[in-house]
């Protein structure tokens, strides 16, 4: 069987203490079967979570497992491809009529200057506000400063990606950058600041709102978090 990557399996894998690669391989199967107390085959897992048993672990299977094990699945935002094709709720790139300004719940700084407001797409504004509020609650101001989570790199910017091949998610106002000085585009783990274990909760907070880290998913551009699936 060819194992495909599914975003829906990642929160399941994280909850089970596995590498969250989205690939429902043998380790994922073993951990799920142990939790569900069923035979270590996908047919048995699917039957245990009331999913039509075809033996192929796809999104429906992941959602069934999550429901059975009380694992919260994040909101599913549109894919990058649908955003760029103009088929998503985010509309056209560069449309500033879709943007709103929000006040960050803790002090942010852009190149040393205080940030009064952040401009993002109205569809993600509430999630951004809630995520940052949760960061403040979990880390507190002292740890936020120590980990440079108060260093803001921008959000809305009608531009192309670093490679210049397509529009950046920033052009829709659905991506934000943090601590760019220590998380440059080409910097990889473990050297990128936001790849450190101390930042695990930071990423868990964003991911709970359906946001995606390019660093965690592709190991580059660790500053970047976006509200669009890869």
Model-derived regions: residue spans:
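Non-transmembrane alpha-helical segments in soluble domains
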Residues: 66, 129-136, 203-207
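Acidic/histidine-rich, metal-coordinating catalytic segments
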Residues: 26, 144-157, 217-224, 228-229
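Second-shell loop/turn segments in exported
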Residues: 1-2, 18, 50-53, 113-122, ...
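Short acidic, glycine/serine/threonine-rich helix-capping segments at coil-helix boundaries
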Residues: 1-79, 213-221
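Active-site-adjacent loop/helix surface patches within enzyme catalytic domains
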Residues: 132-174, 184-185, 212
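Catalytic cores and adjacent binding grooves of peptidoglycan-active enzymes
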Residues: 163-230
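Active-site acidic/histidine clusters and adjacent loop/turn architecture
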Residues: 85-145
């Amino acid at each position: 069987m060819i194992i495909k990557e599914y975003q829906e399996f990642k929160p399941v894998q994280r909850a089970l203490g596995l590498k969250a690669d989205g690939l429902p391989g043998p380790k994922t199967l073993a951990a799920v079967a142990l939790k569900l107390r069923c035979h270590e085959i996908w047919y048995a897992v699917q039957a245990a979570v009331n999913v039509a048993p075809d033996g192929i672990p796809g999104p429906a299977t992941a959602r069934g497992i999550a429901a059975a094990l009380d694992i919260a699945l994040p909101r599913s935002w549109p894919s990058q491809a649908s955003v760029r094709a103009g088929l998503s709720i985010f509309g056209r790139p560069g449309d500033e009529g879709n943007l709103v300004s929000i006040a960050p719940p803790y002090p942010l700084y852009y190149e040393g200057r205080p940030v009064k407001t952040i401009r993002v797409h109205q569809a993600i504004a509430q999630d951004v506000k809630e995520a940052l509020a949760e960061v403040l609650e979990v880390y507190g101001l002292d740890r936020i400063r120590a980990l440079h989570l108060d260093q803001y790199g921008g959000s809305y910017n009608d531009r192309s990606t670093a490679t210049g091949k397509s529009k950046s998610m920033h052009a829709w106002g659905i991506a934000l950058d943090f601590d760019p000085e220590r998380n440059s585009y080409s910097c990889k783990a473990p050297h990128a600041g936001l790849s450190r274990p101390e930042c695990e909760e930071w990423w868990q907070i964003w991911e709970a709102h359906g946001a995606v880290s390019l660093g965690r998913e592709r190991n580059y551009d660790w500053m970047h978090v976006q509200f669009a699936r890869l």
